[in-house]
From Swiss-Prot:
This is Taurine import ATP-binding protein TauB. It comes from Paracoccus pantotrophus. Its main location: membrane. ATP binds at residues 42-49. Residues 4-237 form the ABC transporter domain. It catalyses: taurine(out) + ATP + H2O = taurine(in) + ADP + phosphate + H(+). Part of the ABC transporter complex TauABC involved in taurine import. Responsible for energy coupling to the transport system. It is an enzyme of class 7 (translocase). Its EC number is 7.6.2.7. One of its GO terms (molecular function) is ATP binding.
Amino acid sequence: MQTLKVSDVSLIYPGHHKGAPVTALKGVNLEVKSGDFVVALGASGCGKTTLLNLMAGFMAPSAGQITLGDRPVAGPGAERGVVFQKHALLPWLNVIDNVEFGLKLQGVDARTRRERAVKNLALVGLQDFHKHMIYHLSGGMQQRVGIARALTCDPAMLLMDEPMAALDALTRETVQELLLQIWQQTDKMYFFITHSVEEALFLGSRLIVMSPRPGRITHTYELDFNRRFLAEGNARAIKSSPDFIEMREQILGIIYGDERAGEQEKIHA
């Protein structure tokens, strides 16, 4: 079992034009283990994406440490796949060549690349679109290609930064359900960022709520709505259930309370 640990991590940005430094994250502690689906929620500017970038190795913390297994995270690595809000696919390549691209950069042989790509395109329901060009696909299908590409490199962890933010409501629900089915079939660590409380509750096995800057984890919830969906198959019934609605209102109260507190701090600063 793999574990990614965030240990007392802080990040401070230097001030611009002789301005004061900005503390984006302060004293963040988090563990993500194989099979976890951790969702981060919080107001804009609370440091969710900053935390993901640190976990991905795109940035280094100002204090504290991030480790994967017994090794420090010192930069990007194939063991951590990233899916962005904008898909970052290569428009001059067709679907299957996009999915194979990461493995090609790693020097993996053509037969192995193709086998893995075919497997993961089937996993995201795109087994009939291998030769289609990216610009011929809908937004939801493009994001599914991005997920397949990340999975094809067989990372221990999948980091997802609001991958459904630009999708329409119906497509978003479809991709959410697909993502849970993939989670059920793969023993990986998932870290997912969203601004949607409903999405966070539906997807996460654990939900962390972050405070306004400096970002800290203020609340943690263990959830089972995702497992209920996988067992029952009725997303609408789960999202309209009394316990789901009660939890949603509780989380909204926390986030809106934090936003108001942050606004008051700015007013009195």
